[in-house]
Amino acid sequence: MAGLSSSQIPDGEFTAVVYRLIRDSRYSEAVQLLSAELQGSPRSRAGLSLLAYCYYRLQEFELAAECYEQLSQMHPELEQYRLYQAQALYKACLYPEATRVAFLLDNPTYQTRVLRLQAAIKYSEGDLPGARSLVEQLLSGEGAEDSGGENDYDGQINLGCLLYKEGHYEAACSKFLAALQASGYQPDISYNLALAYYSSRQYAPALKHIADIIERGIRQHPELGVGMTTEGIDVRSVGNTIVLHQTALVEAFNLKAAIEYQLRNYEAAQEALTDMPPRAEEELDPVTLHNQALMNMDAKPTEGFEKLQFLLQQNPFPPETFGNLLLLYCKYEYFDLAADVLAENAHLTYKFLTPYLYDFLDAMITCQTAPEEAFIKLDGLAGMLTEQLRRLTIQVQDARHSRDDESAKKAVNDYDETLEKYIPVLMAQAKIYWNLENYPMVEKIFRKSVEFCNDHDVWKLNVAHVLFMQENKYKEAIGFYEPIVKKNYDNILSVSAIVLANLCVSYIMTSQNEEAEELMRKIEKEEEQLSYDDPDKKIYHLCIVNLVIGTLYCAKGNYDFGISRVIKSLEPYHKKLGTDTWYYAKRCFLSLLENMSKHTIMLRDSVIQECVQFLEHCELYGRSIPAIIEQPLEEERMHTGKNTVTYESRKLRALIYEIIGWNM
């Protein structure tokens, strides 16, 4: 029936055809027919009513509200149209307009429904006292003419939502559990419960309820194509149907992604997003779009920024969008853009940024022009947070001493949250001195924070780095690198390649060559196993370890051994040559060429020939490999022909020929 026009429908069959389309959930086609029919009969009550219904089912809430507004003007005696208009306006997030229309309803028949709607509006606007007052009216049975008062599980849900917004997550869980027991399984209530568990950092029960939602969704609605995209199966969009909304699958997968992301299981987080029912990008809801931007930021930063900037123009957008966009601008050092967004959106600053986050961003932006002033701002923030951490430490001790498990649990959660705020402030302070290469001062900053951070992986990793960079503290660096590596020894490729490389160098510099060789054998064995399982996968860990060791020998002046190590580390080229590995290799070659041009070193002809052959291989295999990863929002892009390993390897080869006087 696709493309059917009014003229093709036999006389007397129009209504039956429209109802069949609605029955089959083919609302878009019904809208086409009804819109055409209403051009001839614009005051048709039946036509407008059906059109409004179809728009509502298509989630075109503003258009539905317009239809209901026309109906309420044509038939002011039928107050249900005004109620439907208010509901559609609420769904369209037009809260002031929805409130205005709802206040016009004074029919006792609709009083309970109006109270529910007004409570929902106030809740969405963030007016929690106003929402609570209306919910309590409903629970007391006021305005109960049409439904006998708020039924038990509806009341529990409403109270649970209010408690959740107020930050009382445990109490919210109790309400949602009570509602679930009273109503039987409901996907939306299960999702609310999972969300409350997530917010109270109880990830295991949250994941249990998410798994339940997903399992039931797959079993009851196989047509929604859950997991198809992850499996690489090309499937068409399932659209934003009412059925999809009722399953709560989209919400469940987004929450699963958030939990995995918090647990640093980044691949699992990305998989959760691709597992959800397939939809076209223009059909994605704001939360999914926001999560896609965050999860894929490392691989597709330009797209990520575009999505977050787009969301900021929408009404509504996920409340985390504003802060995350600003933090990412700072991470990628777009401080001017962060400052512009803050200045242009002062009204969002007070609504979506906590005082802590605002002060942190302000200090980060100040770093660009006034690092000393920024350090003072960060120091003030750090002082406030350390006071909170000390106070919470005492609370934890007191609660444990009095065997108050509930208070102890809450204090521990609060401590962890405060520590997660403190670490970025500390790292921002350290980075100011790191950029000045004042490594002793960085070490001093870290030592001041040992009281709170000695068990934190990020802190331990950065302490290791700063000890390593001082070149006379390799033994101390080993003390911090080793636990990180041993913690993940059975899955050693999950450890950053630079951590493994720095540990190997530290072993070599402290004459622990056997330990270095053992670690490299372990990495090689893991890489061989991974290559066996996935022959096409590029793995760079051992390559980068060898490159860093080669760089070390070059830095010590032993270019014969160092350059040979660098060259061998990139074999086979089709698997080992990449942007990161080329970066390490070319640094050694540039250092070599600089010293050759100054005549401070002499190389054997065989080594020079080896260098030329290496660069020829890089030229051959590096045609599609970027020499550098450009900043995502760079206005002036490099010439695509110049930003390749091939181009840079030719340049280096030409320099070799020039220095040794060979004719090209």
Curated annotation (Swiss-Prot):
Give start and end residues of every TPR repeat. 11-44, 45-78, 153-186, 188-220, 385-418, 423-456, 458-491, 543-576
Alphabetically ordered keywords of this record: Cell projection, Cilium, Cilium biogenesis/degradation, Coiled coil, Repeat, TPR repeat
Q: Which Gene3D superfamilies match?
A: Tetratricopeptide repeat domain (1.25.40.10)
Question: What is the predominant subcellular site recorded for this chain?
Answer: other
InterPro entries named in the record: TPR-like_helical_dom_sf (IPR011990), TPR_rpt (IPR019734), TT30 (IPR039941)
GO-annotated cellular components: axonemal microtubule; intraciliary transport particle B
Write out the annotated subcellular location.
Answer: Cell projection, Cilium
**Single annotated GO MF:** intraciliary transport particle B binding
Q: Name the Gene Ontology biological process terms.
A: intraciliary transport
Matching entries from PROSITE patterns are given as: TPR_REGION (PS50293)
- Claim: Repeat is one of the keywords in the record: yes
Tell me which stretches of the chain form a coiled coil.
507-534
State the family named in the UniProt similarity comment for this chain.
Belongs to the TTC30/dfy-1/fleer family.
Q: What does this protein do?
A: Required for polyglutamylation of axonemal tubulin. Plays a role in anterograde intraflagellar transport (IFT), the process by which cilia precursors are transported from the base of the cilium to the site of their incorporation at the tip.
Q: How does it assemble?
A: Interacts with the IFT B complex components IFT27, IFT46, IFT74, IFT52, IFT57, IFT80, IFT81 and IFT88. Interacts with KIF17.
Name recorded for this polypeptide: Intraflagellar transport protein 70B
What is the originating organism of this protein?
Rattus norvegicus
